[in-house]
């Protein structure tokens, strides 16, 4: 990009425009001449050097005036991280301003490392209690217990899927009730099975996403030969019908898309409800501002660790 293209986006002040008015070659005032400076020719060793901008200084660097702001090359201060006093560092509030390196960071990744390092010191937070917070299909926030045997093979039919979820959740609930009584009565009596809190997992064969198994691909042209016939019969889940040449109609695709959208909407609503329930138990800062999700989790971690220190 030449420097004349740069200065097309370089906003001039009114003083610069007046300077262009007197130095312009035209008899009339052309305001666009401020954004397309004329070509000046320099002589160097008998060769004519055409510089497309008279803002290119002798040392080759582009020199800017102080009076005007370039909105293109350097970012404005408003686009940097907000310096508003609404951001409260919860670590310095609760830990009395410790000088640890991890405590002074404002970002989430360093926070998580420091929380992980302090978490094993709390004896009351037992890992089997966390198992209630995830169904058997979600692999994000589930801790695998040490006593669990080999995992049963997952089948994509409706028959035996809810039974595994129903058997795993009461055992986890029984283990969590045996742990230290840290939670309120409302939390312990919460019905995790029937509250539709974790039904975002893909259990139904009809509600799978657009590409489910081998049924979306036409196996005859050879472009999507993902498996041979025996494997595709086995992938049909014992339903007895071959899926190879089956085309999905746009109506079915639209139904699946709508079902996936409804699942995602329900998941986000449940997540927001869980955050609202968590904000009820956390101490508020008193500045009439609802904590963001990141600040809520940060406050919850600090609050739980402070309660653990208090119990110890």
Curated annotation (Swiss-Prot):
Q: Which Pfam families does the UniProt entry name for this protein?
A: HLH
Name of the protein in its database record: Protein atonal
Which residue ranges does UniProt annotate as crossing the membrane?
none
Read off the InterPro entries from this record.
Answer: bHLH_dom, bHLH_transcription_factors, HLH_DNA-bd_sf
> A GO molecular function for this record?
DNA-binding transcription factor activity
> Where in the sequence does UniProt note compositional bias of the Low complexity kind?
162-174
Q: Does the keyword DNA-binding apply?
A: yes
Top-level taxon of origin = Eukaryota
Q: Which SMART domains match?
A: HLH
List keywords of the entry alphabetically. Answer: Developmental protein, Differentiation, DNA-binding, Neurogenesis, Nucleus, Transcription, Transcription regulation
Q: What gene is behind this protein?
A: ato
The entry describes its oligomerization and partners as: Efficient DNA binding requires dimerization with another bHLH protein. Forms a heterodimer with Daughterless.
Q: In which tissues is it expressed?
A: Proneural clusters and sense organ precursors of the chordotonal organs, optic furrow of the eye-antennal disk and developing brain lobe.
Q: Which GO terms describe its cellular component?
A: nucleus
- Outcome of mutating residue 149 to A, per the record? In strain: Oregon-R, ZBMEL84, ZBMEL95, ZBMEL131, ZBMEL157, ZBMEL186, ZBMEL191 and ZBMEL229
Cellular compartment(s):
Nucleus
**Annotated function:** Developmental protein involved in neurogenesis. Required for the formation of chordotonal organs and photoreceptors. Seems to bind to E boxes. Specifically required for the photoreceptor R8 selection.
**Would you kindly state one Gene Ontology biological process term found in this protein's UniProt entry?**
R8 cell fate commitment
- Tell me the SUPFAM superfamilies matching this sequence: HLH, helix-loop-helix DNA-binding domain
């Amino acid at each position: 990009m030449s420097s004349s293209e740069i200065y097309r986006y370089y906003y001039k002040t009114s003083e610069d425009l007046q300077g262009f008015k007197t130095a312009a070659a035209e008899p009339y005032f052309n305001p666009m001449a401020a954004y397309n400076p004329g070509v000046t020719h320099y002589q160097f060793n008998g060769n004519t050097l055409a510089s497309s901008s008279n803002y290119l200084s002798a040392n080759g660097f582009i020199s800017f005036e102080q009076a005007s702001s370039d909105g293109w090359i350097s970012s404005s201060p408003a686009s940097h991280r907000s310096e508003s006093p609404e951001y409260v560092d919860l670590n310095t509030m609760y830990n009395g301003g410790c000088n640890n390196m991890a405590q002074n960071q404002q970002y989430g990744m360093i926070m998580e490392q420091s929380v992980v390092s302090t978490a094993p010191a709390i004896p009351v937070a037992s890992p089997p209690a966390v198992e209630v917070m995830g169904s058997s299909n979600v692999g994000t926030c589930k801790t695998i217990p040490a006593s669990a045997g080999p995992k049963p093979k997952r089948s994509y039919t409706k028959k035996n899927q809810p039974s595994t979820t129903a058997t795993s959740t009461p055992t986890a609930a029984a283990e969590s009730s045996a742990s230290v009584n840290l939670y309120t009565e409302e939390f312990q009596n919460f019905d995790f099975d029937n509250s539709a809190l974790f039904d975002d997992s893909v259990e139904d064969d009809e509600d799978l996403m657009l590409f489910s198994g081998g049924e979306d691909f036409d196996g005859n042209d050879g472009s999507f030969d993902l498996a041979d016939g025996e494997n595709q019969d086995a992938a049909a889940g014992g339903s007895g019908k071959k899926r190879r040449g089956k085309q999905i109609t746009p109506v079915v695709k639209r139904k699946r898309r709508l079902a996936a959208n409804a699942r995602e909407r329900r998941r986000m609503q449940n997540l927001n409800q869980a955050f609202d329930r968590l904000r009820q138990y956390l101490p508020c800062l008193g500045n009439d501002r609802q904590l963001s999700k990141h600040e809520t989790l940060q406050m919850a971690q600090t609050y739980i660790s402070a309660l653990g220190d208090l119990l110890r």
